[in-house]
Amino acid sequence: MTKIPPGEPDELFDAADERGFFPEKRTRNSPATAPAPATDTHYHGHRDRLRARYREHGDAALADYEILELILFRLIPRRDTKPIAKALLDRFGTLAAVFGAPLHLLQEVKGVGESVALDLKLVATASHRMLRSELRNKQVLSSWSAVIDYCHAAMAHETKEQFRILFLDKRNTLIADEVQQQGTIDHTPVYPREVVKRALELSATALILVHNHPSGDPTPSRADIDMTKLIAEAAKPLGIALHDHVIIGKDGHVSLKGLRLF
């Protein structure tokens, strides 16, 4: 049996217990077999009822915070996760915004440490991969709603501007999806020559430009419009078409092609 050496500080037991495996803080003098208070396990029946409701009725029977609770059950097995789920939604507003939030902001919510934040981001990554897989081997222009869903999930809640390019072949099938630049809160530097160079490297014959506005408002700026025109002009002589430039906001998107801005 491992014993604590005499004189070891009680702080040995004070390490962060993010996943709640120890319902009470223990010290050297605490009895190892002390029974946990009844309130520490009151949430187990709630978890069973919530799982049963989801099993029988699906997600339509659950509020957003309850869906988040179901996920947190696995991540934090020994703690009441309802307050954490509600705190996350209070902080970020929507389920999508919770999963889209940066790691450091997730960890500012009480009860969420690095491990739980990473696991929440893993759920978001799985969702993004699933949406992106819907674009594979499909004609992108005929799957436009899938393109928007994917781009919105991947970019709408980024806190900095991100410039992404979808490279297409002559059948308008997706060849590559690449983030070209990461900028500041309101600006991303884009170099038309580099965009065209990368298209030639991939043997792409068409492009869709996508970037986000962290402010949430997808209205294009004059700089957005001018940059789009420059890329279209650089690509056209090389037989590369610019199909669209889409700006993603938190609650919607704008198509520059749809607005006839280039």
From Swiss-Prot:
Sequence motif: JAMM motif, positions: 211-224
Stretches that traverse the bilayer: none
Biased composition (Low complexity): 31-40
Classification via CDD domains: MPN_DUF2466 (cd08071)
Residue ranges occupied by any MPN domain in the UniProt entry: 140-262
GO biological process, one term: proteolysis
Disulphide bonds in the chain: none
Binding residue positions for Zn(2+): H211, H213, D224
GO molecular function per UniProt: metal ion binding; metallopeptidase activity
Entry keyword set: Hydrolase, Metal-binding, Metalloprotease, Protease, Zinc
Positions of region (Disordered): 23-44
Family, per entry: Belongs to the UPF0758 family.
NCBIfam families: PRK00024.1, radc
Protein name: UPF0758 protein R01728
